[in-house]
């Protein structure tokens, strides 16, 4: 996966709601490692599925982003979660 591309995709498509790994709509459903683990989302496959299909207030990005962009952003989210979203 291309983490630099994932960062670019995140910035352009995800950061409005998930800046710094947070969640402006549902405060407990963050992209922080603990929350991802708690909700069974701490894997690339789980994140890819969520990005593709959306859930609740989160829109589906399948058809808006390529499979490669979605894979890259999932890898970026996991990488950032492991680093505590410290940059």
From Swiss-Prot:
Keyword terms: Electron transport, Heme, Iron, Metal-binding, Photosynthesis, Thylakoid, Transport
Gene3D superfamilies: Cytochrome c-like domain
Gene Ontology BP annotations: photosynthesis
One Pfam assignment: Cytochrome_CBB3
InterPro entries linked to this entry: Cyt_c-like_dom, Cyt_c-like_dom_sf, Cyt_C6, Cyt_C_IC
Post-translational modification: Binds 1 heme c group covalently per subunit.
GO-annotated molecular function: electron transfer activity; heme binding; iron ion binding
Gene Ontology CC terms, in alphabetical order: plasma membrane-derived thylakoid lumen
Record flagged with keyword Thylakoid: yes
Family per record: Belongs to the cytochrome c family. PetJ subfamily.
Function according to Swiss-Prot or TrEMBL: Functions as an electron carrier between membrane-bound cytochrome b6-f and photosystem I in oxygenic photosynthesis.
Protein name: Cytochrome c6
């Amino acid at each position: 996966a291309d983490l630099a591309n994932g960062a670019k995709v995140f910035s352009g498509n995800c950061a409005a709601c998930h800046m710094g790994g947070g969640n402006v709509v549902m405060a407990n459903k963050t992209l922080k490692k603990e929350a991802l683990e708690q909700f069974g989302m701490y894997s690339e496959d789980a994140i890819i599925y969520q990005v593709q299909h959306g859930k609740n207030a989160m829109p589906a990005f399948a058809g808006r982003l390529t499979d490669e962009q979605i894979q890259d952003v999932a890898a970026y989210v996991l990488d950032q979660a492991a680093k505590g979203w410290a940059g």
